[in-house]
């Protein structure tokens, strides 16, 4: 792919396990880490994953510590999503968040992640007017936000926009299926690509891949439709609520780690209960302060 800055043709030559330094899924040892600095994952490594029938993991990240933790845990792609709107800034949807709000988050993630590919969402209203607007916004995210790639929502209507961005040197991940920025026109959170509508998503994916998108993300799409899309295009696919045939999977980290309360979407698997852990820690701290147990002698000068 033209978006890569690396001349390596082999994924295993550059990137640590599972993409190098030993058999697939083998954990890196301390001696491995000491031998050489960790190399940055590039878009062509994701392509190699699809070509080899391998998979990669993607999580959202919005600030330093989660970026560091997920990067050290081996997550290959970090998404500075417009989901920050309702997971950081307290909005009900992703629509209100702006470019100027996302850029500082993007910088923090890009500075903190030493290995992961950092992808930034272009928020609603920042690319729809014209290809020129999209290129200008994309440049800001690479130049000011330090992102390595951007993501835009929409089907084949945006193929020319993707083409213009790629020609300008901006790697683009396309996002089809349920597109949260279009929730009002789609009638709310609804599965896309059922029945006869499946062909529309296939056509969208083909057009976007041909325009130069390095990957196509599908959200809330039936597993059979997602498999058909994945088979129809050469570039890697990413799924969120799209079955397990995609090359990559993505989740919002607060959902994955159990930080957000309330009912989770069907496609979310919760791997921790951080909300309860943090609540218990805050309660214990408050109790210690109110009863005079903190700070104790060991915390005083």
Swiss-Prot record:
Q: Which InterPro entries match?
A: Pantoate_hydroxy_MeTrfase, Pyrv/PenolPyrv_kinase-like_dom, Pyrv_kinase-like_dom_sf
Low complexity bias located where? Answer: 1-28
Kindly state which keywords UniProt assigns to this record, in alphabetical order.
Cytoplasm, Magnesium, Metal-binding, Pantothenate biosynthesis, Transferase
Q: Which GO terms describe its biological process?
A: pantothenate biosynthetic process
Lineage, top-rank taxon, reads Bacteria
Residue positions annotated to bind 3-methyl-2-oxobutanoate are 82-83, 121, 151
Q: What CDD domains does the entry give? A: KPHMT-like (cd06557)
Q: Please list the residues that make up the active site.
A: 219 (proton acceptor)
Q: Which cofactor does it need?
A: Mg(2+)
- What residues does Mg(2+) bind to? 82, 121, 153
Cofactor comment: Binds 1 Mg(2+) ion per subunit.
- Region Disordered, residue ranges: 1-37
Which PANTHER family does the entry mention? 3-METHYL-2-OXOBUTANOATE HYDROXYMETHYLTRANSFERASE
Family from the record: Belongs to the PanB family.
- Its protein name is 3-methyl-2-oxobutanoate hydroxymethyltransferase
Give the gene symbol: panB
């Amino acid at each position: 792919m033209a978006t890569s800055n690396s001349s390596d043709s082999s994924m295993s030559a550059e990137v640590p396990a599972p993409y190098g330094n030993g058999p697939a899924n083998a954990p890196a040892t301390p001696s491995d880490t000491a031998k050489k600095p960790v190399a940055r994952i590039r878009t062509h490594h994701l392509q190699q994953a699809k070509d080899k029938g391998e998979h990669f993991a993607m999580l959202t990240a919005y600030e330093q510590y989660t970026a560091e933790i997920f990067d050290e845990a081996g997550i290959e792609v970090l998404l500075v999503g417009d989901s920050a709107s309702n997971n950081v800034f307290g909005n009900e949807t992703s629509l209100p968040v702006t470019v100027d709000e996302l850029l500082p988050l993007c910088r923090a993630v890009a500075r903190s992640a030493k290995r992961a590919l950092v992808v930034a969402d272009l928020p609603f209203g920042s690319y729809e007017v014209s290809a020129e607007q999209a290129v200008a916004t994309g440049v800001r995210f690479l130049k000011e936000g330090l992102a390595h790639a951007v993501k835009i929502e929409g089907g084949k209507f945006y193929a020319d926009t993707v083409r213009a961005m790629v020609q300008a040197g901006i790697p683009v991940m396309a996002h089809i299926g349920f597109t949260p920025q279009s929730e009002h026109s789609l009638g709310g959170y609804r599965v896309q690509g059922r029945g006869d509508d499946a062909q529309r998503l296939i056509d969208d994916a083909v057009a976007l891949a041909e325009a130069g998108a390095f990957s196509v993300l599908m959200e809330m799409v039936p597993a059979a439709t997602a498999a058909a899309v994945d088979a129809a295009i050469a570039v890697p696919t990413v799924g969120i609520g799209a079955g397990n045939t995609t090359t990559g999977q993505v989740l919002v980290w607060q959902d994955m780690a159990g930080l957000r309360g309330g009912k989770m979407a069907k496609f979310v698997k919760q791997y921790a209960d951080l909300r309860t852990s943090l609540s218990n820690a805050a309660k214990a701290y408050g109790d210690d302060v109110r009863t005079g147990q903190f700070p104790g002698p060991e915390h005083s000068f």
